[in-house]
């Protein structure tokens, strides 16, 4: 192990930093697997209960027809994926679905709309959704695309807890994935959200054709923000027929995926690291390694936007095998 990796992996306690170098982050990622896992688990235990996992549920409140050209996404209007576009859901139906998610064990409800950015006419029903979810005693999260300063403020005033806005991959590889917006556009919205006082949920996707360097740089970008994202979702690509990346995607080696989780935990020790999309393609053993590496959050339910998810019964069985219990930050199940 080189001296850079050794000094970081041997650190006595987790430190919040915003000055990670390329060399340092890469050295940690490529460290011997046992050393990497030991350090990630040590840091994880100093901040979180290793036997508790935070549970979220995600609902697509507006499907398809998106003006962006993200090469992996079935909801882009640029791709022929046979996914019909839908109108924005009625707030009452969203709130009803959120209550069912709460009763199933979710403490945070995430709502996604397939937009480049919301129009002003969309803000009133979106705000009603946020307020309705909050009234259930849950945390509310939304992903609506790029925001203006005023829209971020409106969401903050409504009580929105989290805003999801992934950077997907490294800045260097980004143009190979998305051409309708820039990497800087993503960072600009993150800044607006944080300035409004909303917590940030931001991560990326593995399996887009990126190199390990791109995974390291994606996490280094997030770890070097003035404030770490409070939640860092790590997705494994589920190739969708009709999307450009489905033709060129390469499967991610399970150990490389686990290394990415561990690096996120080490570089952002107080952030929730979410094992997000792609769990249907992961064995129980791979998911267990991810939890050991510092993942402490998942999405529950049968679907994530337009892709499959293991479902509550499989997750309960996995949790039982591993001795994991859902983390109940807010005591929401006192209402159930």
Curated annotation (Swiss-Prot):
Entry keyword set: 2Fe-2S, 4Fe-4S, Biotin biosynthesis, Iron, Iron-sulfur, Metal-binding, S-adenosyl-L-methionine, Transferase
Catalyzed chemical reaction(s): (4R,5S)-dethiobiotin + (sulfur carrier)-SH + 2 reduced [2Fe-2S]-[ferredoxin] + 2 S-adenosyl-L-methionine = (sulfur carrier)-H + biotin + 2 5'-deoxyadenosine + 2 L-methionine + 2 oxidized [2Fe-2S]-[ferredoxin]
GO terms assigned for molecular function: 2 iron, 2 sulfur cluster binding; 4 iron, 4 sulfur cluster binding; biotin synthase activity; iron ion binding
Comment on bound cofactor: Binds 1 [4Fe-4S] cluster. The cluster is coordinated with 3 cysteines and an exchangeable S-adenosyl-L-methionine. Binds 1 [2Fe-2S] cluster. The cluster is coordinated with 3 cysteines and 1 arginine.
Enzyme superclass (EC): transferase
Single biological process term from Gene Ontology: biotin biosynthetic process
InterPro entries the record matches: Aldolase_TIM, BATS_dom, Biotin_synth/BioAB, Biotin_synthase, Elp3/MiaA/NifB-like_rSAM, rSAM
Start and end residues of each Radical SAM core domain: 51-270
Pathway in which this enzyme or protein is active: Cofactor biosynthesis; biotin biosynthesis; biotin from 7,8-diaminononanoate: step 2/2
Entry binding sites for [4Fe-4S] cluster: 66, 70, 73
Protein origin, superkingdom: Bacteria
Pfam families: BATS (PF06968), Radical_SAM (PF04055)
Binding-site list for [2Fe-2S] cluster: 110, 141, 201, 274
Cofactor(s) annotated in UniProt: [4Fe-4S] cluster; [2Fe-2S] cluster
Enzyme Commission code: 2.8.1.6
Stored CDD domains: Radical_SAM
PANTHER family, per database record: BIOTIN SYNTHASE, BIOTIN SYNTHASE, MITOCHONDRIAL
Described purpose of this protein according to its UniProt entry: Catalyzes the conversion of dethiobiotin (DTB) to biotin by the insertion of a sulfur atom into dethiobiotin via a radical-based mechanism.
Quaternary context: Homodimer.
Protein family membership: Belongs to the radical SAM superfamily. Biotin synthase family.
UniProt protein name: Biotin synthase
